[in-house]
Swiss-Prot record:
PROSITE patterns: KH_TYPE_2, RIBOSOMAL_S3. Keywords: Chloroplast, Plastid, Ribonucleoprotein, Ribosomal protein, RNA-binding, rRNA-binding. It comes from Staurastrum punctulatum. It is found in: Plastid, Chloroplast. NCBIfam families: rpsC_bact. This is Small ribosomal subunit protein uS3c. Part of the 30S ribosomal subunit. GO terms for biological process: translation.
Amino acid sequence: MGQKIHPLGFRLGVTQSHLSNWCVQPSQYSELLQEDEKLRGCIKEYVRKYVRTAENYGGIDRIEIQRKTSAIKVEIHTGFPKLFVEKLGPRLKEIRREMQNTLQKSKHLKFIISLAEVEKPYAKATILAEYIAVQVERRVAFRKTIKKAIQLAKEQGNVKGIKIQIAGRLNGAEIARSEWAREGRVPLQTLRAQIDYCHYPAHTIYGVLGIRVWIFQEK
C-alpha cells in the first residue's frame, strides 16, 4: 500500500505555520506541548456544549497559542465570531478558571483569550468538515451533503480544487466502505501548493464516520 504523509505536517515552514509559538528548554517542551493540547481540548469542549447545536456548529478553524513570561495568549480563529460572543461571552470567567485548573505548570499565568474572524469560512477544511459532520449526524444523505459542501467551498471564490471523503457504515450498511468526490485540482505532491486538510469524526447511531477534506486554494 502507498504511505500517505499528512498534508499539513509536510508543508510546515513552507505554506503552513505552527499553532503553538513559544521557546522553552528542551526538558520542558513535551510538558508544555501537552498543556497546549489540553487548552485546545478545553475550548472545544465548551464549544461542543454551549455553541454547537443541530442548527449551529462551532466553526473553529484553528486555535493558536503564544506563551510569554507572564501570560498565555489564546487566539481562536472562527468563521462565526458573533455566535461565539453570544454563547460563550457570559462564560468567559468560567472558561479561564477551567483552563487554569487544567494546567499544572502554568496555573499562575494570566490568560488572554481573543477571537479572530475567518473571512471565508467555507474555504477552510476544518469548518467545512464540521459542517459535513453536523449534517450527517442529522441523518441528511451523505451524497447530498458532499455536493452541498463542494458548492459552499466553490462559492468562496479562492478555492481551485476540493476533495471530500467519508468512510464508515454509510446509510447504516452492514459493511463499512468509503465514498469520495473531487472537483478541480488537489496537487498533494506540490510543496508550494496551498493545501488545507482536516480529518473529523461524525458520531451516528450506526457508529463513527471519518470525514476527510482537502482544499486547494489560491495563494
